[in-house]
Amino acid sequence: SMSKECDGKMLFNIKSLMLPLDSITEFGDECYAHLSEDETQKETLTEHTRRCQKYWFNIVEAKHIETVFIKFEQLYMGDITNEARHIFELMSVNVVTLHDIGKINPLFQKLKMKNSWKVEYVPESISSRHSIVSAIFYLDYFLDIINTAKGDGRINRDESDVLKDFAYIYSYIISRHHSDMNNLEYFFSGLTGKNTEGDNSGKDAYDWYEMFKQELYKEPVVKLRKRDEWLNRMAYQSNEKNIYLYAWTRLLYSLLVAADYYATSEFMNGYENNDYGNVNNIDNIINEYENNDVQKS
């Protein structure tokens, strides 16, 4: 259904925007995403990511969600350069691609996947958690792309700021994909080490990833926004814009949860599910997902 839109804009080709995992990390085949019930079968991170991408794309197509994408882009982003639009689309589509990349946490591999991998880099403070590490990885990856585009003059300051808003929102979605969407502010405070409830797992994950990247690649991790700058940017928006944003965030969250659920079920049960009828009732999937022990690993 990649037809022309009535205003003559080409529908963006979602499939071509999906990044292969091996363009983002070299460890997709060395690290595992899931174990079978009897622990005899292991699903690599690469395999799980491909399955998630497949279901994500299929659901978007089956439900004609690309029209929502285009509408949101027009309403929220307004008039932006093609380059900024491309980065926005890349970031949106690849939430699903990077959502489990934090499973390269050596302690997740060891404790959950029974896989002794890079044990010299075992984190001290984040234990075997993976969602928050995925969130940091996602942020670093896309903030770098945004900073480079701005540095090259391909996007302007305003575009860069808005794209960064989305990088943070999307990393938040990733950090919550095994739990309820709670408070964006809570997440951001934790990233910057300023969480009033003492949950600074975001900062801890950032510090671990910084060490990991430095040791392996001698590369720094992108510096994060200050908490106040973030809160101010969010507070200045019109209510209408915030409503669009909230709906959009829920949609991407639901899509991620559904795709992950289908992909995990395919590995566990050994067959594909092409019936997306119940995706209409995406809340059921989210509830089923949150109460599903397979997903708690």
What do the predicted segments below correspond to?
Residues M2-D7, N13-Q295:
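Accessory nucleic-acid engagement/destabilization modules that flank
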